[in-house]
Amino acid sequence: MLKISILTPIYGVEKYIEQCARSLFEQSYAPIEYIFVDDCTPDKSIGILQSLLKEYPERAQQVRIIHHEKNRGVGAARQTALMAATGDYLLFADSDDMLPKDAVEKLAEKADSSHADLIDGSYREWCDGKADMLQKPFDVADGKLLKLLVCQNIITNRLWGRIYKRSLIMEHRIFFEEGINYAEDLFWNAQFMFYGKKVNIDDAVYYYRTDNENSYNHNISEKNLLSYFKSTRRLIDFFEQNDTEHQYLRATEIGIVNAYRWAANAHVAFEKVDQALAYKPKSCLIRLIIKLIKKGVPVKRVNLIYLAYRRLYTLLISAPSAVS
């Protein structure tokens, strides 16, 4: 049977860690390795986790809790867990979320039968103790999926609700970067999808909590935006080095516009975006769109051009003779 490593960073989740950990320990699948990374959490999260382990003696021997000497952020915590993992596949579980009891079993069964690099499952959003409607993964070819991801704001760049083949991660050194704590999943997933092959399952394998106001997704601060800009720059670097046929150039430049849209909406100086990205788009239209945003044209008006162009691109890549 395949061994699955579940990787969970812990910081400031004493309200949620018990519910999360119980869902992990009560999985129907046996060969699981649990790696929790304590990123110097200031609350009682680790104590709650350690007390809970007494109720699951059969799982306790499968658990490792790694402590950071100082708070280093979620990017570093994910990387610490990744490097400690020994499983055939990795499953990222955030410490305020939950898994259905048969989630790992269903993902592992599909991995075993398909030998795919990425097994992508369905999920439900969780709010106020209730699960929302089922969200299924995009059922499109791998190359198109990556282009949609890189365009940004079309499909999610989530790490959770999936399992990733560890050997492919190590072979291509697909690592997280300390200091990128928001949108760290964007450039990480793009790299994995560039090399890997994906299959889907329709079963719900993850409950994604939307009512935790302390999560990164609820705090779009300037600090988080700067992290997102850095993630986008890493994306540019990766494709400049590896996309020799420029298959993802247009998608990358469409995604770059998103950084300026976010900056405008958050009133972040455009100079900070320019400095972080350090990139001049090849497309004249993309340069024009960015210029309009920087000149103060309302984003809603610029979107009339930008979203139409993005929509046209997504239609073209779906055509039989797809464009780059």
Name these PLM-found stretches:
Residues D97, D102, E245, A251-T252:
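A compositionally biased, intrinsically disordered/low-complexity signal enriched
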Residues L146-C151, I236, E253, D274, ...:
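Generic detector of well-ordered alpha-helical segments enriched in charged/polar residues
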Residues D185-L186, R250-I254:
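Alpha-helical scaffolds flanking conserved acidic
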Residues N71, I155, I254, C284-R287, ...:
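Helix-centric, low-specificity signal for extended rod-like, repetitive segments
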Residues Q50-L53, A108, I236, E240, ...:
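Residue-level detector of alpha-helical secondary structure
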Residues K197, A204-N212, H218-R250, N258-S283:
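Catalytic core of nucleotide-sugar-dependent glycosyltransferases
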Residues M1-K230:
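Nucleotide-sugar donor-binding/catalytic module of glycosyltransferases
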Residues H267-S324:
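Membrane-interface aromatic/basic loop that binds lipid-linked glycans or pyrophosphate carriers
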